[in-house]
């Protein structure tokens, strides 16, 4: 297992897999700010196999597993080889429509269990939004970052939600988004 030291390394993994022209399958979607923070903190690692890269985001609370590969068959073969290398608890997020059932089965067959199944919904049409002037409500500041983090961990499950880190919260605060 090797540490990822730049976003360019991740882009090279994507290019490697796409250049094979055998298909492209991933659960990793690049977020430049978030993933740069993971790299700076030394939390992002990879293991490479033929036709497949596994990326691991390792933290004190949750280990997230991501993959970049060609097909679900290739994923299954390489997952069998990968699991003995990293025997700690891992969380895998799989996002998609009904077609991902086969992908879910790849992980279940290797001993993973479904922890949470979420459904995303959208609304057609515009949502009426009324801005209400509330004098006692204001945007959070840097000194509030730990409280925001504590609230997120109190009300959301870190195993089923990818909660932001303290550094990500500071970034959102700087944008006046909280």
Could you describe each region identified by the protein language model?
Residues 4-35, 80-104:
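An N-terminal domain-start capping segment
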Residues 54-56, 65-66, 92-94, 121, ...:
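Hydrophobic beta-strand residues in large extracellular and virion-surface proteins
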Residues 70-133:
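Acyl-donor-binding surface of acyltransferase catalytic domains
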Residues 1-2, 42-44, 109-114:
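Short glycine-aromatic motifs
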Residues 176-178:
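Conserved small/polar residues in nucleotide/adenosyl-binding loops
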Residues 163-170:
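A cross-taxonomic marker for long C-terminal extensions/tails that follow the last structured domain
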Residues 1-31, 118, 130-162:
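Short amphipathic alpha-helix that is part of the acyltransferase structural core
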Residues 27-82:
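Conserved donor-binding loop and adjoining core beta-sheet/short helix segment
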